[in-house]
A protein has these predicted regions:
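Short, polar loop/linker segments at the starts of domains and inter-domain junctions
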Residues: 41-56
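Short glycine-aromatic motifs
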Residues: 26-31, 129
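Active-site microenvironments of metalloenzymes and redox enzymes
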Residues: 56-155
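Positively charged n-region of N-terminal signal peptides that target proteins for export
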Residues: 1-4
Length: 161
């Protein structure tokens, strides 16, 4: 299943190398194939259960840009900042953009920020994808260049703090 990373999270492109499988050519080259596996989550799935199993999935290699999200809001006007329901976005939603459909000068290729979970989910759905689950996100974020789970490595911790 394809999974798209939105920048209300963080970019993982440099942290995926231990989890990333060879690209099978069936999905966009903008996505990394993350191998499935098992790990201990900081949020156990059930009382007394420590290990979580993750099936393989795909994750965008780079954050969603303002230009990409602007294209989405032009195609899905209900997600424009001047039309979105307040239930789905707060008053900071895309507040730094020049207009309801244009990011403004110099920020088109920067990561989009100040989007809600609902808007991020709708963006993914429009692309035929979904947001990663908590466990998928945690699993991918725990990887370093040399370890599938580097959370106990002080050097890795310094790179993410």
């Amino acid at each position: 299943m394809r999974v798209h990373l939105t920048t209300w999270l963080i970019a993982l492109s440099g942290l995926l190398s231990q989890q990333v499988a060879a690209d099978d050519g069936t999905a966009s080259s903008r996505m990394a194939a993350v191998r499935g596996g098992k790990f201990e989550s900081v949020l156990p799935p059930a009382p007394g259960v420590k290990e979580v199993s993750i099936a393989g999935f795909r994750l965008d290699r780079t954050p969603v840009t303002n230009a990409q999200f602007a294209r989405f809001v032009r195609e899905q006007p209900e997600w424009r900042r001047d039309q979105v329901a307040t239930l789905f976005a707060d008053d900071q939603y895309l507040s730094y953009w020049a207009s309801a459909v244009e990011p403004g000068a110099g920020i088109a290729n920067q990561p989009v920020v100040r989007v809600s979970w609902f808007a991020a989910s709708a963006y993914c759905e429009a692309r035929g994808a979904r947001l990663p689950t908590w466990y998928e996100w945690e699993y991918a974020a725990a990887a370093s260049a040399t370890s599938a789970d580097a959370r106990g490595d002080p050097a890795w911790q310094q790179t993410v703090l």
